[in-house]
Regions:
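Flexible glycine-rich active-site/ligand-binding loops centered on an Asp-His dyad
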Residues: 122-153
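Conserved small/polar residues in nucleotide/adenosyl-binding loops
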Residues: 184-185
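Short, conserved beta-turn/loop elements at beta-strand boundaries and strand-helix junctions
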Residues: 17, 110-116
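Short coil-to-beta-strand transition motifs
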Residues: 2-8, 95-105
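Short acidic (Asp/Glu) patches
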Residues: 72-95, 101-103
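Short, solvent-exposed secondary-structure boundary/capping segments
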Residues: 114-124
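Active-site acidic/histidine clusters and adjacent loop/turn architecture
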Residues: 13, 19-20, 24-80
């Protein structure tokens, strides 16, 4: 069996400081953007020349917070309620033989200043400090497959959930709204 070694090309800066705060997919939190800071020797403007012409990027990264836990042949995907087991290769679980993840994110801009190259990213699903091993432009003609099927994740999850409040809680929320003059819910 072959072994491979990869260099870290950058690090993610995001509002999510721990893995339990991270959305399950990019795009779920509108204001959850971040940055990708390239590290030496990859922090050169030439390395990103032409990238500004793409709206979205694939970010390949390391699941650094779960890699020491090792891999598992079966996992319980959250989309199945955490009750049914699936083979790890049929999921996007972090507990993989090679702890490599990929995320499709919007590229909002590129800043090159002195020895820094920073990619400004839209909504993402990565914890702050995530090591990045590669970036690739998203190619809509090749990667958007309208006839593809996806087993248990064929449709996007519901955007919201109904929440019911007790009359006492509703009264407390109304008091807060009046006091602060803005909607609480």
């Amino acid at each position: 069996m072959s072994a491979f070694q990869f260099a870290q090309i950058g690090v993610i800066r995001s509002p999510y400081k721990e893995k339990f705060a991270v959305p399950r997919q990019p795009g779920l939190v509108k204001h959850g953007g971040g940055e990708l800071h390239l590290v030496a020797p990859y922090n050169q403007a030439d390395a990103v020349r032409g990238l500004e012409n793409f709206s979205h990027l694939w970010i390949l990264f390391v699941f650094h917070q779960t890699m020491e836990g090792g891999w598992r042949p079966t996992v319980r995907p959250p989309r199945l309620g955490g009750n049914a087991r699936m083979g790890v290769f049929a999921t996007r679980s972090t507990f993989r033989p090679n702890p490599i993840g990929m995320s499709l994110v919007e590229l909002k801009g590129i800043r090159c200043q002195k020895d820094q190259v920073i990619l400004e990213l839209g909504s993402l699903d990565l914890v702050d400090g995530t090591p990045v091993v590669d970036i690739k432009p998203y190619l809509p003609f090749a990667e958007a497959l309208p006839d593809a099927s996806a087993s248990y994740a064929q449709q996007a999850p519901l955007a919201g959930m109904n929440v019911s409040f007790t009359p006492e809680t509703e009264a407390q929320l109304l008091t807060l709204e009046k006091r602060d003059r803005k909607s609480v819910v």
